[in-house]
Amino acid sequence: MAAEEATLTVRLIRSFEHRNFKPVVYHGVNLHQTVKEFIIFLKQDVPLRTSLPPPLRNYKYDTLKILHQAHKAKTNELVLGLEDDDTLLLKEDRTLKDSGVASETEIAFFCGEDYKRYKANPISSW
């Protein structure tokens, strides 16, 4: 079976409150790899991207959540939608494809603790 590859946009979220994020496009992502393998890849790749400012490169990202899938509705949230965590948060033991990721999917990469704190009190600082 040939590896199914996709183009994904990963939104690195540094701060929910300050709406501090940056999208990074990845081409040729194997959708048959597990979410955990993709997280490991991102943790190795992000610090090496000199085009990103140091606060984004050196942050403790650990969680992936689907933001938007091609040809489907987008959320009104500017940084990340707070709903549907049970279906949109990616579980590490599943493959990207089994998690609903397809070509042109936009995924958020963030610190899970920050997300829980923001979800409990979703107030922006500006």
UniProtKB/Swiss-Prot annotation:
Q: Which InterPro entries match?
A: UPF0538
- Pfam families documented for this protein: DUF2340
Protein family per UniProt = Belongs to the UPF0538 family.
What is the protein name for this chain?
Answer: UPF0538 protein C2orf76 homolog
Source species:
Mus musculus (Mouse)
Q: What is the lineage of its organism?
A: Eukaryota, Metazoa, Chordata, Craniata, Vertebrata
